[in-house]
């Protein structure tokens, strides 16, 4: 077996399963959140919720529109772990520790997380409140900012895994 992720959080969070998170070593290339607009896909719009796993499953299960992003993440599953698209809250955790995990990601042969603005925007699995049919949140690993974005735009994804003890 080879490494696929690096642990970046070992706390148990209220309302979240597991005992922390690990970030995948590599980005998923540009993917759209959804292949069409006008459909709420059943994800949370709560910016504080650690619900990326539930959100990604909701995206995958929506029959009225496909989620190329969720499908690409599900294609990663190996070694029994289940990767998913992080929520805004989970991306905030990763952002705060990115400078610490980057050397470990690189040692394992992965792509370091961006530390500056530029090519630093990643999809989250969190839809925008009251605009769920059209927009979801992007997260900047360069600045920690979030930006509402039409779901049909293609952006990078950095999956995470829940740690279960």
Annotated model-derived regions:
Residues 1-83, 120-121, 150-165:
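Extracellular adhesion/carbohydrate-recognition regions
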Residues 59-83, 88-141:
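An exposed tryptophan-centered "aromatic clamp" motif
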Residues 143-150:
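Carbohydrate-recognition loop of C-type lectin domains
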């Amino acid at each position: 077996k080879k490494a696929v992720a690096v642990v970046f959080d070992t706390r148990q969070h209220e309302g979240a399963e597991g005992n922390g998170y690990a970030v995948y070593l590599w980005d998923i290339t540009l993917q759209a959140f959804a292949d069409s607009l006008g459909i709420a896909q059943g994800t949370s719009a709560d910016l504080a919720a650690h619900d990326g796993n539930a959100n990604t499953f909701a995206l995958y299960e929506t029959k009225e529109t496909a989620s190329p992003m969720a499908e690409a993440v599900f294609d990663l599953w190996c070694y029994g772990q289940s990767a998913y698209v992080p929520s805004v809250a989970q991306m905030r955790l990763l952002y705060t520790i990115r400078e610490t995990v980057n050397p470990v990601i690189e040692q394992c042969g992965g792509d370091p997380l961006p530390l500056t603005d530029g090519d630093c925007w990643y999809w989250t699995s969190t839809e925008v409140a009251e605009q769920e049919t059209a927009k979801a949140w992007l997260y900047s690993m360069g600045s920690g900012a979030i930006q509402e974005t039409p779901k049909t735009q293609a952006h990078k994804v950095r999956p995470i895994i829940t740690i279960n003890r």
